[in-house]
């Protein structure tokens, strides 16, 4: 029987309302609630089961250095999307140590077919998505990548190159600051004695690459508040002409900023370009964190995966 203040002692209702033996007497038992609203923790993101492989197309002559760089970029992408099947194919590869892009794609296609046949379901999509490890367009290299894709018979998809993009402007800024050629933080107005007052943005791929690099160059110029001009390493005299143009506009201390990942150029080319311009050079972009994030962002856009904000960026076209 219940009283006005609650169930009577000894009644079934009272027993049901009593706290468990381990609970403190007289205290309410708080049940865990699922967090909602903007403070709710996001669900952990993972690659969908059966998602296409991400194949990183690495240009240039294969080497231990280019393999380490590509593996680090792939590792960054995997850390942002657990379960991602990331592979590396070399445009100029051709052996077990440095497998060619064509061979990697053919192997991915064979595995994809076996999986589809085992599931007995319609083909869900491409076997692989190819992401060129290039900061900007290089028509000759992209033509070779497309040819390898066609020869593989994989039906793989090809994404855009990584730039132009604000994240690449950030990476360029970091590389310049590491070389002592720019302030490490544009918000801190301390003086760097060797800071450049004019930047040559070095790229490869001819005029198309120069125009694309110029877009990222404008973003870099806004970050550093110094003039930035793009020039092609593969156009004779372009670097020295650009250096002269900057000096004529008032720049006294120039710096070379490679708008390059690294494997796409031969050893010594950057040093020769810096000597031609009469200035110091920063390192190539390499496996900087945003490079791996852009690789993943291009893959995700092709596959239809929505990434968290920190793992993607808004491209500039």
Regions found by a protein language model. Give the residues of each.
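Active-site-proximal alpha-helix that buttresses catalytic centers in soluble enzyme cores
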Residues: 1-317
């Amino acid at each position: 029987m219940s009283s006005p203040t609650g169930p009577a002692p000894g009644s079934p209702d009272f027993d049901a309302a009593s706290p468990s033996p381990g609970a403190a007497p007289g205290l309410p038992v708080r049940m865990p609630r699922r967090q909602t609203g903007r403070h709710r923790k996001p669900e952990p993101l993972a690659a969908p089961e059966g998602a296409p492989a991400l194949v990183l197309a690495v240009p240039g002559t294969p080497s231990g250095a280019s393999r380490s760089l590509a593996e680090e970029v792939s590792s960054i992408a995997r850390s942002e999307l657990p379960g991602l099947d990331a592979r590396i194919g070399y445009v100029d590869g051709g052996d077990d140590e440095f497998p060619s892009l064509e061979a990697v794609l053919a192997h991915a296609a064979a595995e994809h077919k076996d999986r589809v046949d085992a599931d007995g379901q319609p083909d869900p999509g491409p076997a692989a998505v190819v992401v060129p490890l290039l900061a900007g367009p290089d028509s000759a290299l992209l033509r070779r990548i497309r040819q390898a894709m066609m020869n593989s018979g994989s039906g793989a998809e090809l994404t855009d190159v990584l730039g132009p993009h604000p994240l690449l402007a950030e990476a360029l800024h970091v590389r310049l600051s590491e070389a002592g050629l720019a302030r490490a933080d544009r918000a801190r107005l301390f003086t760097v004695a060797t800071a450049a007052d004019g930047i040559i943005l070095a790229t490869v791929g001819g005029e198309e690459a120069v125009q694309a690099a110029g877009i990222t160059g404008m973003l870099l110029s806004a970050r550093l508040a110094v003039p930035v001009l793009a020039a092609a390493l593969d156009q004779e005299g372009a670097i020295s002409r650009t250096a002269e143009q900057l000096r004529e506009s008032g720049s006294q201390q120039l710096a070379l900023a490679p708008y390059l990942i690294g494997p796409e150029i031969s050893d010594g080319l950057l040093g020769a370009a810096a000597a031609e311009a009469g200035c110091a050079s920063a390192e190539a972009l390499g496996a900087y964190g945003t490079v791996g994030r852009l690789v993943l962002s291009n893959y995700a856009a092709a596959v239809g995966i929505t990434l968290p904000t920190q793992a993607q960026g808004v491209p500039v076209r």
